[in-house]
Swiss-Prot record:
Stimulates the secretion of gonadotropins. May be responsible for the regulation of the hypothalamic-pituitary-gonadal axis. It is found in: Secreted. Synthesized in preoptic neurons and is transported to the pituitary in the preoptic-hypophyseal axons. The gene is gnrh1. Belongs to the GnRH family. Keywords: Amidation, Cleavage on pair of basic residues, Hormone, Pyrrolidone carboxylic acid, Secreted, Signal. GO terms for molecular function: gonadotropin hormone-releasing hormone activity; gonadotropin-releasing hormone receptor binding. The modification Pyrrolidone carboxylic acid is found at residue 23. It comes from the Eukaryota. The modification Glycine amide is found at residue 32. This is Progonadoliberin-1.
Length: 94
């Protein structure tokens, strides 16, 4: 009986201690979940480069010249969604 209890304690300790003393570090994260802000602009630059490019959007859609305010609004929305994703927040549109 004592051997079974000892084996149970060892099994319990073997499963709890390795999980409690380790931390998973994702790419770009420092210990404690802090992100290096110097590389944040590089990350945004890489994201913008991955978007598909169209030479003249109006030639494809037949629209008028897009105002600079609409472009700024889209960039602001993109930056807000990136910041929310970084902080773990999600917003749901109705």
């Amino acid at each position: 009986m004592a051997a079974k209890i000892l084996a149970l304690w060892l099994l319990l300790a073997g499963t709890v201690f390795p999980q409690g003393c380790c931390q998973h570090w994702s790419y770009g994260l420092s210990p404690g979940g802090k992100r290096d802000l110097d590389n944040f602009s590089d990350t945004l630059g890489n994201m913008v480069e991955e978007f598909p490019r169209v030479e003249a959007p109006c030639s494809v859609f037949g629209c008028a010249e897009e105002s600079p305010f609409a472009k700024m609004y889209r960039v602001k929305g993109l930056l807000a969604s990136v910041a929310e994703r970084e902080n773990g927040h999600r917003t749901f549109k109705k």
